[in-house]
């Protein structure tokens, strides 16, 4: 029997789901019987602007998500939107209505299937899965990273990110990094403009000194080149100015990544875009593309594959970066625990009290903390360890919606 394109895509997604499902990412009988009872959304507006080579975010809308299953609550966070202070979170979150009444095991399978069949994107799937896996650990009374057999526990350096075009404004952010003792690893957003990028590099290297690992992310912003030698020369100029590494300098094929890394030698390239989503990156990963590889929140889609990808990067003797999606709240500790459990080189997904303190005001328990410039396990709690003061959160949030 012939399948039309839609039927084939659906069948392929279900085949992938059945192929890559695994015991440690599944539910025991105990939690399989627990059901999704309610979902609540809390919107937090962040008005600190963020500058990229592709656009400027003047404000952004974060949604803290609580999924309730019996007496257990799972917490997550989504960067839901940008530049709309009146964003409709009920409309945005309506896709979560599909989970109403589902057993936890079925809800996890549903989210994975939706992503693998390309019906949900990673920004929809990941927050739902994080909250559901949080519930799994809480029902089992075990940390979820233990259920996932992620056994490393060494603290991981936190990466402070500076997103400013203006050197003086960048130096203001650099002082915040210094005040927070987050200077061992610093990331600069770059813009594909040699003059601006060199000025930022020189100023920040001078500010932080020689001991800081200074990396940059151009978001594929270097476009004015015809031969890789030209792009390599720009990377080497940045290295001479004090830069250690560059994430996604330009739109590159796998072969171009490999050739460029060979041309720039001890200057480290960090592929990010080629690592998205995790289930595809498992096949596309080539260790010769860079010295470090980024697992970026909101782009992996599914976490069994993200963990496999992280282990594959480490097994190839390459550095592992856990990135960020401008997160400010409950998602940060999840990514920090993933970074610690995998033995990452650094983690960018750290709390940002200088941009919003709502999370810090409302969280009552969590498993990680930032100390001496590193994220470390403070006390491993069931699930991902998040507990929130919901009365205070409801009061501080810009919007609150209970979907059901």
Ranges and model annotations:
Residues 187, 215-216, 245-246, 270-272, ...:
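Generic enzyme active-site microenvironment
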Residues 253-258, 262-268, 275-383:
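Shared catalytic-loop signature of beta/alpha-barrel
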Residues 1-4:
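N-terminal secretory signal peptides
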Residues 7-26:
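N-terminal export signals
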Residues 33-38, 67-140:
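Metal- or metallocofactor-binding catalytic centers and their adjacent structured scaffolds
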Residues 65, 71, 128, 141, ...:
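Conserved, mostly hydrophobic/aromatic
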Residues 146-264:
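Metal-dependent enolase-superfamily TIM-barrel catalytic cores that perform enediolate-based chemistry
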Residues 31-84, 357-361:
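Structured beta-strand/loop patches that form or line metal/cofactor-binding pockets in enzymes
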